[in-house]
Design a protein with these regions (language model features):
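Short, surface-exposed coil-to-beta transition loops
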Residues: 3-5, 55-59, 80-84, 96
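Short acidic, glycine-rich loop/turn motifs
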Residues: 49-53, 75-77
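Non-transmembrane, membrane-adjacent beta-strand/coil modules in membrane-associated proteins
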Residues: 54-55, 70
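Beta-strand/loop substructures that line and gate deep hydrophobic ligand-binding cavities in soluble
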Residues: 64, 72-132, 136, 141-145, ...
């Protein structure tokens, strides 16, 4: 097993980043290769993805949750064995997201999957796409110009 640790700062409060991350069904919008995530019940989700050119499916189960702070889940049927994501306030409008991914690199090699470095790069890319999504979606109000040529 290997642990991949990545982090990113986002220009939204931690509670907004957490609220967006809790929308598992929207993961395909920022997670490379993920095609669909379906809620099975309050804690379990079914995933469909294309990874390393192969279609794959697996289930995850949420194992820990602390509102606006932390979310953890384990996986069955995937080389990603578990994830922990934490949300840390940096200011009233900025936060840091830290993601730990437990990756079975030996299991991946046996199935012709991705290298540890490739998965690490994909995880960083996922965080960067999440940042773009959340910052676009939660833009602070009051800074837009309503009229371009308004006389002062």
């Amino acid at each position: 097993m290997s642990i991949i640790e990545k982090s990113i700062e986002v220009n939204v409060p931690e509670y907004k980043a957490y609220a967006q991350w809790m929308k598992f069904e929207e993961f395909p919008q920022f997670m490379e290769g993920v095609k669909e995530v379906t809620r099975l019940d309050g804690k379990r989700f079914h995933w469909k993805a294309e990874i390393a050119g192969r279609n794959t499916e697996w289930e995850t189960e949420v194992t820990a949750q602390a509102a606006d702070q932390r979310l953890a889940w384990t996986s069955r049927g995937s080389v990603i064995k578990g994830c922990v994501v934490t949300f840390h306030p940096l200011s009233s409008a900025k936060s840091k997201i830290m993601l730990q991914v437990e990756y079975d690199s030996q299991g991946s090699a046996e199935h012709g999957g991705e290298t540890l470095e490739a998965v690490s790069q994909r995880v960083q890319g996922d965080l960067e796409r999440f940042k773009a999504l959340i910052e676009k979606r939660w833009r602070p109000p009051g800074r837009d110009t309503i009229f371009d040529n308004f006389p002062m």
